[in-house]
Amino acid sequence: MGKLIELLLHPSELSAAIHYKLWRQPLHPRDLSKESTELRRCYELLDVCSRSFAAVIRELHPEVRDAVMLFYLILRALDTIEDDMTLSRDIKIPILRDFTKCMKTPGWKFTDSDPNERDRVVLQEFPVVMTEFNKLKPKYQEVIYDITDRMGNGMADYVIDDDFNNNGVDTIAAYDLYCHHVAGIVGEGLTRITILAGFGTDVLHENPRLQESMGLFLQKVNIIRDYREDIDVNRAFWPREIWHKYAEEMRDFKDPKYSKKALHCTSDLVANALGHATDCLDYLDNVTDPSTFTFCAIPQVMAIATLDLVYRNPDVFQKNVKLRKGTTVSLILEASNVSGVCDIFTRYARKVYKKSDPNDPNYFRVSVLCGKIEQHAALIKRQRGPPAKTIAQLEGERKEMALSLIVCLAVIFSMSGLMAYIAYVSGFRWSPREIFDSKMFPLRD
């Protein structure tokens, strides 16, 4: 009920939600009749692990769809081992360091995960995953083996790092390194798959900083947003080099008396994340396949919108904040091309700037970064020119106009009905005859 009220209060988001549900068609729908039982099961496992990622992966070009899906499941299996607090280091470390050997062992699976681990089913049915993995083109297998090996060893390093586990991240350099191991390496793997498929320009290969920024931007936004969730279980991913400028202990930010310092700290972290935004735009500008572009763009526009949500928001320190469903759907529909993504980044950069407080020590830095994002987005749009509209897009716009009218009328009638109901339960009574007889509104003398 709450989500419905949210949509009614934001008619444009309601319109987007209806459009997404009724008319949006994937560029490359799956043909289930050509899929093996094992492959269909892998996509079911993908749904178990992440419905949001499952939706965008399913819409990828057939050349890379299965490779990306299996890549995700394998890394999810690896992550499940690392996150399982019921497993001892003696069990975890050998598996994490030698996970590629496990992948090459016929029939290997792991059944000793915590029963409360939702994703343990991937480890339990790992032979099904590997059956389909072994059908991939060797070039994609090679990338996945390499990234999995590096991620597994990186995870093992953090598992045995007592200083990290007890004290969290110390410096900004260590913060970047952690985000690299968690997300940057994944971005490298996806970029290599994209290049091998011929879906990206040489710029992606020649400038690895772009793929690194894609991963770091996403991870840093998640880390800022998840402050309360992490601090409540004694995890700390905000770098001490930043937060210690504003408090003695990171958990102090939960206390309302530190609210001003807490907001200054988030603005410092937001500025750090915003530094990756222009690289993200450059990366997306060099993805040539439409479905791969959408796959890459959707997480990035969610990230910039989330950054606006957490910026100078005291709720971050009291609960886990997240975007409205309607906002998410609107962003998905808008992020269909480079021009749309540039518009989104510009819009949210302006919103961040407008929220800025001149008394915040990070005010100037945030303002400059927002200006750079807006200028860079404008440059990319100018170089590209206006995107040509297809017949399908024009038809979609006509449907959108009709839908907007329907939604507006629906909202008007819904609100009118609600007001009439409130009046009725409050004791007001009237009839059409009273209105026409002017008894409700007697003429003045």
Curated annotation (Swiss-Prot):
Record's catalysed reaction(s): 2 (2E,6E)-farnesyl diphosphate + NADPH + H(+) = squalene + 2 diphosphate + NADP(+); 2 (2E,6E)-farnesyl diphosphate + NADH + H(+) = squalene + 2 diphosphate + NAD(+)
Any one Gene Ontology BP term: ergosterol biosynthetic process
UniProt membrane topology term: Multi-pass membrane protein
First-level EC class: transferase
Membrane spanning residue stretches: 291-311, 405-425
Annotated compartments: Endoplasmic reticulum membrane
Cofactor: Mg(2+)
Name recorded for this polypeptide: Squalene synthase
